[in-house]
Amino acid sequence: LSCAAYGIIRNLIVVQGSINYEFFQYLLIGFGVFSIAIAIPFILVQHDLKRLLAYSSVENMGIITLGLGIGTTLSIYGALLHIINHAIAKSALFYMAGVITGEYQTKQIARIRGLVSTMPLVGTMFIISVLAITGTPPFNIFVSKFIIISAMFTSGRTVLGAGILLLFAGVFAGMMYYCLTMSFGSKPKYRASAVTVGK
């Protein structure tokens, strides 16, 4: 994701002095909104834990692209900060997912239940990581999301900002539904592994 964002930034620098710069900005905004919007249905109907995290990355790439497309100093700063914040939060989340899938021997969300009671430490860290990646305050991604949204409103893009907030709410609802279901749902009747990581 960071490499893709770097590629967009390089192109942004190249076209910045051209007469088509405004068109390029609108193109980035369009791709950003599309990326966030298209991630939501896939998140809401997902059955695979790691694919769920992958579609979350699609949403976050949209946020970065959107910040670059707005084109103000504030939004670009927010986009650059979001690249760093996402890398930290998503790395932690994929690590937790690796431990969870190793313990339960499956990536199927429906078969992962009772994380907090089965692996208290891992379950707690998983919840924290999901809260972080969805931009819940006071975690780092909240800051970069807030900066980008603020840039939309201060640059006069009120409707766009309001729409993006609604999309963020959809992503948050989907991610937290799966997170809480896996963390506090009834324990499965069988366990395929006896790994005790996080107990």
Language model: regions and residue ranges:
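Glycine- and aromatic-enriched alpha-helical transmembrane segments of multi-pass membrane proteins
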Residues: 197-199
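Hydrophobic transmembrane alpha-helices and their helix-loop junctions in integral membrane proteins
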Residues: 1-186, 194
